[in-house]
């Protein structure tokens, strides 16, 4: 009723009034974006006087509330952070700890001094998140940055969003994450075209690096790219690192609590990314001049000369990286706090200045509990190490890593071995089936342990016996405990034993993919003391969580990587922990676990020496000792424990309660206890080691040579540019490549038989590298595999196919920005496309067209594995062969591009006589049509790097959070090819015959030539471009703003602009006093009243929400029609109903032919509720579209009548004309093919 009344009132307006109304609304929106709220209010009131409606009234109310809120407050006060020159909002500044202010000053010094990047490597739990948010607050307030890209693991998104809201409520923060491609794209466009922070994940970066690095088809330069948990790019050849380097950025900041986890090459990789190659030279030089001497010096059997050289080289390395690197440990911060006179002064005199005092951290005792193997474990361990047939029984490969994996399982629990191995080793009456071997870890787990009694499960493992007694004692004492393990099957056993003992437990592992559920369990554990145990996998639970309610941590099995275990411990030992923390690391005596621990100690000494934690830490073990992993030692006593006890026995920090607890631990039949936290408390005397070679100039010369080589490589501009162009950072620096493709000679190709899998073309190198990567289920893995070992063959077989199947142990795959082999899959986009391609290959007139525009279409498959023959040329199809058919995307009526919203897959079965009929009918009249059909649907690649990989999941594949994307994978990759349309300029505007048999989103997905593999997933990316720069006449519809005001300097509601044209209250505090004389109020986006900024954002974006209301839609559409009649000048935009596809091929080709190659078309994201704003006047009347629809229906009806009368040729003409208007009706398409078939027979 209200809608009809509003429509009637709008109908009463004259064309002049309608035009004035729309003009006022448009100008009011522009004023709002520019921050002039008074002018916006005035203009909205004028619009209301002409035509009052709910939409305008709502906007007026919002602006009035914002003005009132602003008027109530005076100026914000700002403070210079540590005299660095960066002004920070006072209230925010006063809530920061002193060391956090120093961190912000360090970040600003990088910007101020022209350094392009740096690493903030504070210990875990010291608030790196808060430091970054406060730094960005000051930078945005001073208008020094506009666009920031923040990349992090998926599990941390909610934490960052919560902290942004808490500290800087006025900052515009959006996420590029989630299943909705439209929403992701819209958020990215808002940040790129206005300003603010966009948050995304490493997986999203890998899948969408092109979209994140471009806007409207051009390179988009971010002011800052910030990586949290930056050790994800510790290897420069991982997918995360490669894609991150492809994002153009003026400045890069890395956040990590563990800058080195294994070796110094990881440190080089981080600095090479952060400083964009301008600090540590090339990897080869760094390895030779720095890594090798330092690593050798850390070994116990190093000569005095090697030790002295390593010491001096590490000192030199620290001096080089010092301006770019800041790391503080908890102990260092605590010591500084206790000796800081300013803090003590402020405590006595509160008026001196507000300094937020850091709370005291509790004591941490990190204990190593040396566990003896039970007789059963000891027996199996000895047999495995000594007997060949036992190795063959338990081993799937001869890889030494696999042997270590089996030995680690034996140390934890024999039931971790396969069901067959347990049965053959007489470990109870375990069932075994082939299915167990196929499905891996979890499938047989239930049957595997359900038949075993609790007592048996405990007695088979020394660790399990100790753990049950320990957890019972801790529960009785009222402590909450975290239990970490690398294996879900260990957690399954522990969970069952604890539940049977009536423990209240919670659990998080890789199978908990929903962030909401994770947050719920964490919150429950933090607030409810009844939950005494929290079970977590080290990979998932060890990153980004705060679990300070617990005061005890158990590491059930040690990791090869010392940082992994350290991160797990820091879930508890961080700011906010009020109780003393005790950590229990369970390690078995005389086994591979003890040697893994010794390896951890060796790595840790490297980290401490090179990052400055220790000048010269004590050398505990030699490299030779670390190599002896497979020797059998004393299972009753630990040599490592005895060695450490002799060094550190008297240094343990303890109290009466801890002493009593340690006495209890000794009563649990353990071999001994060591103190991990006392490691490296001893330093060697530097003088002692340097005396031997005090007079030698060799060391000094080596240090000078190393520094000279690194500096010369870093400062060599030509070398730097060459590295960038050869690598991924120069992907935007490369010149556009325009290659004239030659026609392929026509050859007689054999008809291929349908195969169950893709052929693989590998060199001997690749085969050996792939074989080397096959290891047993539960081996320790990095989160991302090094791609450098996997080379994809660039050789293309003569039949035109580009098959490549790589089997990897990995959870995901995507398109990389660097060329790693070129795989083109030729998919037909429609039935007519198939027929036309087939006859073209037979007649030879479409060879060039086929070669120029293969459809590089990528589709996700469901998680169940399949190998599919993806790329057969259509001339090779046999009779009744089933074709893998992709649903062609509907044409966007505004962009004239074919888009692909989701992968709708169907299977079409075509008899050969159908194709023959179509071929015969089209042979004479539609050669040009065939070419035109091919071109708009094909998507030329802009990046020559597409490939398909088959992936084999690891046993703990669920622990990688990227697995949660697999249920939405077809929605995650987004970049539509934009170059294809431009090639249609020279094509005759003829009719296109296209067939779409699947418009439904819920169409069942089917795949042909399927062969099931164990836990394999095929993940492909969406369409991408082949060449670096093709033609940008058609811009990417996902990269444009939902607003048309590109020429207007846009107001950022979150951050004031340094521009005299803006209202004074939005000025940065750094504006000169002469400008600020008329300022009513200055505000920071960190102030609480900056919530008004959010209101302004809502006003700006209101058309996207309110325009969904029927009244606003109908009334303003009516007003726009009236405005068109008035003849007022307006920008020309074609507006058609997106739900209809009335675009004829004539219109399409003419539109394309008139577009200029360099022109950037105005486009909108496909998900925007109202692509064109109210203020835009449109030209194309909807009557034409309605008329076209009517013509379409008439043509279809007439064609059916002619068909019934037997007039085949006339009926075919009508239906082809109908398909010119609307090409997506499957009924008409099939009818047309049927007529072609009949015509051919006659």
From Swiss-Prot:
Residues where Phosphothreonine is found: 815, 1055
GO cellular component: kinetochore
Subunit structure: Interacts with PLK1, which phosphorylates it. Both proteins are mutually dependent on each other for correct subcellular localization. Interacts (via N-terminal TPR repeat) with BEND3 (via BEN domains 1 and 3); the interaction is direct.
GO terms under biological process: cell division; DNA repair
Domain of life: Eukaryota
Residue ranges constituting the Helicase ATP-binding domain according to the UniProt record: 109-277
Domain Helicase C-terminal: 466-626
Protein location: Chromosome, Centromere; Chromosome, Centromere, Kinetochore; Chromosome
Pfam families: Helicase_C, SNF2-rel_dom
Function in brief: DNA helicase that acts as a tension sensor that associates with catenated DNA which is stretched under tension until it is resolved during anaphase. Functions as ATP-dependent DNA translocase. Can promote Holliday junction branch migration (in vitro).
Annotated TPR repeat ranges: 21-54, 1192-1225
Database matches in CDD domains: DEXHc_ERCC6L, SF2_C_SNF
E.C. no: 3.6.4.12
The protein's name: DNA excision repair protein ERCC-6-like
Source species of the chain: Bos taurus (Bovine)
Motif (DEAH box): 228-231
PTM annotation: Phosphorylation by PLK1 prevents the association with chromosome arms and restricts its localization to the kinetochore-centromere region.
Region of interest (Disordered), residue spans: 1103-1181
SUPFAM superfamilies: P-loop containing nucleoside triphosphate hydrolases
UniProt similarity note: Belongs to the SNF2/RAD54 helicase family.
């Amino acid at each position: 009723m209200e809608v009809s009344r509003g429509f009637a009132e709008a109908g009463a307006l004259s064309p002049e009034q309608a035009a004035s109304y729309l003009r006022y609304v448009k100008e009011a929106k522009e004023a709002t974006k520019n921050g002039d709220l008074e002018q916006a209010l005035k203009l909205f009131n004028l619009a209301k006087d002409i035509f009052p409606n709910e939409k305008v009234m709502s906007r007026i109310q919002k602006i009035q509330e914002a003005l009132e809120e602003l008027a109530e407050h005076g100026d914000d006060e700002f403070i210079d952070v540590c005299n660095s020159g960066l002004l920070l909002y006072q209230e925010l500044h006063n809530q920061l700890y002193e060391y956090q202010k120093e961190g912000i000053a360090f970040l600003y010094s990088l910007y101020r001094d022209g350094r392009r990047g740096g690493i903030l490597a504070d210990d875990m739990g010291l608030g790196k998140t808060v430091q970054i948010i406060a730094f960005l607050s000051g930078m945005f307030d001073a208008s020094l940055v506009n666009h920031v890209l923040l990349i992090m693991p998926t599990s941390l998104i909610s934490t960052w969003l919560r902290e942004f809201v808490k500290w800087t409520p006025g900052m515009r923060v959006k996420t590029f994450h989630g299943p909705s491609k439209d929403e992701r794209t819209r958020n990215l466009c808002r940040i790129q075209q206005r300003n603010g922070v966009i948050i995304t994940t490493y997986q999203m970066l890998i899948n969408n690096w092109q979209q994140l690095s471009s806007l409207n088809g051009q390179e988009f330069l971010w002011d800052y790219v910030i990586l949290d948990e930056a050790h994800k790019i510790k290897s420069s050849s991982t997918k995360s690192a490669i894609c991150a380097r492809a994002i153009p950025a003026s400045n890069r900041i890395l956040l990590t609590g563990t800058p080195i986890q294994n070796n110094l090459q990881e440190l080089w990789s981080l600095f090479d990314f952060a400083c964009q190659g301008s600090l540590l030279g090339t990897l080869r030089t760094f390895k030779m001049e720095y890594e090798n001497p330092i690593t050798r010096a850390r070994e116990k059997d190093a000569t005095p000369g090697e030790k002295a050289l390593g010491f001096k080289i590490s000192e030199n390395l620290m001096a080089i990286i010092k301006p770019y690197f800041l790391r503080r440990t908890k102990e260092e911060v605590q010591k500084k706090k206790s000796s800081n006179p300013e803090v003590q002064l402020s405590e006595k005199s509160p008026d001196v200045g507000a300094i937020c005092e850091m709370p005291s951290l509790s004591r941490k005792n990190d204990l190593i509990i040396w566990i003896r193997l039970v007789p059963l474990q000891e027996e199996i361990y000895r047999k495995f190490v000594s007997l060949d047939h036992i190795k063959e029984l338990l081993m799937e490969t001869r890889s030494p890593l696999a042997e270590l994996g089996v030995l680690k399982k034996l140390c934890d629990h024999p039931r971790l071995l396969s069901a067959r191995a347990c049965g053959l080793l007489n470990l109870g009456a375990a069932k075994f089936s082939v299915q167990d071997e196929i499905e891996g870890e979890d499938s047989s787990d239930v049957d595997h342990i359900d038949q075993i009694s609790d007592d048996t499960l405990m007695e088979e493992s020394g660790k399990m016996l100790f753990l049950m007694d320990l957890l019972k004692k801790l529960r009785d004492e009222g402590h909450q405990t975290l239990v970490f393990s690398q294996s879900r099957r260990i957690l399954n056993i522990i969970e069952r034993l604890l539940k049977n003992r009536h423990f209240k437990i919670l659990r998080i592992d890789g199978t908990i993919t929903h962030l909401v559920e994770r947050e719920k369990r964490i919150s429950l554990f933090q607030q409810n003391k009844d939950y005494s145990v929290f079970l977590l996998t080290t990979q998932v639970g060890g990153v980004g969580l705060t679990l300070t309610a617990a005061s005890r941590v158990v590491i059930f099995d040690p990791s090869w990587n010392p940082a992994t275990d350290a991160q797990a411990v820091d879930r508890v030992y961080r700011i906010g922990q009020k109780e003393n923390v005790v950590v229990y690391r369970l390690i078995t005596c005389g086994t591979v676990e003890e040697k893994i621990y010794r390896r951890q100690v060796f790595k840790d000494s490297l980290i401490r020496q090179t990052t400055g934690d220790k000048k010269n830490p004590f050398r505990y073990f030699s490299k030779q000792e670390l190599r002896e992993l497979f020797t059998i030692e004393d299972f009753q006593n630990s040599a490592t424990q005895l060695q450490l006890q002799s060094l550190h026995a008297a240094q343990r920090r303890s109290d009466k309660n801890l002493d009593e607890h340690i006495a209890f631990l000794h009563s649990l039949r353990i071999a001994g206890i060591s103190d991990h936290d006392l490691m490296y408390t001893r330093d060697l005397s530097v003088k002692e080691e340097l005396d031997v070679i005090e007079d030698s100039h060799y060391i000094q010369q080596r240090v000078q040579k190393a520094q000279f080589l690194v500096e010369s490589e870093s400062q060599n501009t030509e070398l730097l540019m060459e590295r960038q162009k050869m690598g991924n950072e120069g992907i935007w620096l490369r010149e556009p490549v325009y290659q004239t493709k030659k026609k392929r000679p026509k050859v007689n190709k054999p008809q291929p038989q349908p195969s169950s899998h893709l052929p693989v073309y590998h060199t001997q190198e690749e085969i050996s590298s792939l074989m080397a990567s096959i290891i047993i289920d539960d081996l320790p893995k990095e989160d991302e595999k090094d791609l450098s070992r996997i080379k994809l063959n660039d050789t293309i077989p003569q039949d035109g196919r580009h098959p490549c199947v790589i089997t990897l142990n990995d959870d995901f795959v995507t398109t990389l920005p660097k060329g790693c082999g070129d795989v083109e899959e030729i998919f037909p986009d429609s039935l007519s496309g198939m027929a036309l391609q087939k006859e073209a290959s037979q007649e030879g007139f479409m060879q060039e067209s086929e070669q120029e525009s293969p459809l590089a279409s990528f589709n996700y498959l469901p998680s169940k594995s399949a190998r599919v023959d993806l790329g057969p040329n259509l001339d090779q199809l046999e009779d009744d062969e089933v074709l893998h058919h992709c649903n062609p995307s509907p044409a966007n009526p505004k962009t004239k591009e074919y888009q692909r919203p989701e992968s709708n897959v169907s299977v079409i079965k075509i008899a050969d006589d159908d194709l023959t009929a179509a071929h015969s009918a089209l042979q004479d009249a539609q050669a040009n049509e065939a070419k035109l059909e091919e071109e708009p649907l094909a998507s030329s690649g802009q990046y020559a790097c597409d490939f398909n990989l088959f992936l084999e999941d690891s046993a703990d594949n669920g622990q990688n959070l990227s697995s949660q994307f697999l249920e939405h994978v077809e929605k995650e990759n987004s970049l539509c090819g934009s170059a294809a349309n431009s090639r249609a300029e020279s094509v005759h505007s003829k009719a296109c015959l296209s067939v779409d048999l699947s418009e439904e989103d819920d169409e069942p997905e089917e795949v042909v030539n399927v062969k099931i593999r164990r836990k394999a997933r095929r993940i492909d990316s969406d369409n991408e471009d082949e060449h670096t720069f093709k033609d940008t006449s058609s811009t990417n519809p996902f990269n444009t703003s939902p607003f048309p005001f590109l020429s207007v300097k846009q107001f950022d509601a979150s951050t004031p602009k340094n521009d005299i044209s803006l209202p004074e209250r939005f000025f940065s505090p750094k504006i000169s006093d002469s400008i600020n004389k008329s300022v009513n109020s200055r505000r920071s986006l960190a102030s609480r009243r900056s919530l008004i900024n959010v209101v302004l954002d809502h006003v700006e974006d209101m058309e996207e929400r309110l325009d969904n209301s029927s009244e606003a839609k109908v009334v303003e559409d009516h007003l726009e029609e009236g405005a068109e009649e008035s003849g007022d000048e307006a920008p020309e935009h074609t507006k058609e109903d997106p739900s209809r596809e009335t675009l004829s091929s004539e219109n399409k080709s003419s539109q394309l032919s008139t577009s200029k190659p360099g022109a950037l078309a105005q486009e909108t994201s496909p998900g925007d509720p109202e692509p064109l704003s109210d203020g835009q006047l449109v030209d194309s009347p909807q009557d034409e579209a309605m008329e076209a629809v009517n013509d379409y229906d008439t043509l279809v009806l007439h064609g059916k009548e002619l068909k019934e009368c037997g007039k085949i040729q006339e009926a075919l003409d009508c239906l082809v004309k109908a398909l010119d208007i609307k090409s997506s009706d499957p009924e008409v398409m099939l009818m047309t093919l049927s007529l072609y078939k009949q015509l051919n027979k006659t």
